[in-house]
């Protein structure tokens, strides 16, 4: 698959969870299957398609759980498990998160902006003083590469730094604080919220952010990583961080750890 997504959904009719695993295939179509139904098959989500890097989020709107999907050269969709809706005026997003009932997103072709939807309405992207809008980042931090919801803030990762956005209520009350300036490039596909920290890879190696401070972790790993880290990707599961990247010798690897001082291990997949 090209990507995997989790649609967190509650079925009011049965009073049970109805979470769906959604898979993007190599032909850029999407299929879903039930997480909790044993033996369930994959079903195509008709007319949901992507072009380029995709992203997703879950949002409860008008009493329904929605799966939100977008891609850098595609459209923005909402899906309630039955009905798919294309939102024509939304930007093409490369990452998104939900915070304080708004969607915050990085957008294809607008490398110095973070967009946000109207309050309590993920379908409204019309720019206005009390609706949707965007925040410009024009200093030396480089491109905006990913947004992450963490500890009641939106953390905005850039090529060479991290900003913390406080965003509750009206746009006029939004505020941005620079919390980290990097001397080495940050790789967007390695940024993973993991419990009480966000872990990410830079040209210098692995680092973690606790919301206020950044520190180096697993320093010995840097000796094994190739200087070309552009294709590095990571995910998190059960409190562990899994990273796939090129090494200094042929093959790929995955690394997992629970924190920076215990339960660490490197696993070479030779793939």
Please name every model-derived segment:
Residues 57-87:
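Hydrophobic or amphipathic alpha-helical targeting/insertion segments
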Residues 31, 76-77, 163, 207:
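WD40 beta-propeller blade core
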Residues 35-38, 79-82, 120, 167-170, ...:
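Short loop/turn segments that connect beta-strands within beta-propeller blades
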Residues 4, 56-58, 96, 147, ...:
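Hydrophobic core register within WD40 beta-propeller blades
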Residues 36-61:
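A broadly used, surface-exposed interaction patch
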Residues 1-42, 92-164, 245-269:
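N-terminal beta-propeller domains
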Residues 46-51, 86-90, 136-140, 178-183, ...:
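Surface loop/turn motifs at the tips and blade-to-blade linkers of beta-strand repeat domains
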Residues 65-66, 101, 140-271:
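Beta-sheet-dominated scaffold domains
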């Amino acid at each position: 698959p090209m990507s995997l997504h989790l649609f967190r959904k509650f079925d009011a009719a049965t009073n049970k969870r109805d979470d769906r695993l959604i898979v993007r295939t190599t032909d850029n179509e999407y299929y879903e299957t039930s997480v909790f139904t044993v033996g369930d098959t994959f079903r195509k989500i008709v007319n949901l398609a992507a072009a380029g890097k995709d992203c997703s989020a879950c949002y409860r709107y008008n009493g329904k759980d929605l799966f939100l999907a977008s891609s850098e050269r595609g459209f923005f969709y909402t899906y309630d498990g039955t009905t798919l809706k294309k939102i024509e005026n939304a930007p093409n997003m490369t990452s998104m998160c939900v915070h304080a009932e708004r969607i915050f997103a990085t957008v294809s072709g607008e490398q110095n902006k973070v967009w946000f939807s109207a309050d309590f309405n993920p379908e409204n992207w019309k720019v206005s003083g009390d609706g949707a809008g965007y925040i410009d980042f024009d200093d030396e931090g480089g491109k905006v590469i990913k947004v992450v919801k963490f500890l009641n803030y939106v953390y905005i990762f850039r090529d060479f730094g991290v900003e913390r956005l406080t965003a509750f209520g009206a746009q006029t009350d939004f505020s941005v604080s620079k919390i980290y300036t990097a001397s080495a490039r940050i790789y967007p596909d390695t940024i993973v919220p993991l419990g009480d920290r966000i872990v990410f890879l830079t040209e210098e190696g692995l680092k973690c952010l606790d919301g206020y401070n950044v520190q180096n972790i697993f320093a010995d790993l840097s000796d094994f990583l190739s200087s070309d880290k552009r294709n590095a990707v990571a995910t998190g599961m059960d409190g562990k961080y899994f990273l796939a990247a090129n090494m200094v010798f042929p093959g790929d690897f995955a690394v997992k750890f629970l924190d920076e001082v215990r339960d660490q291990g490197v696993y070479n997949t030779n793939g």
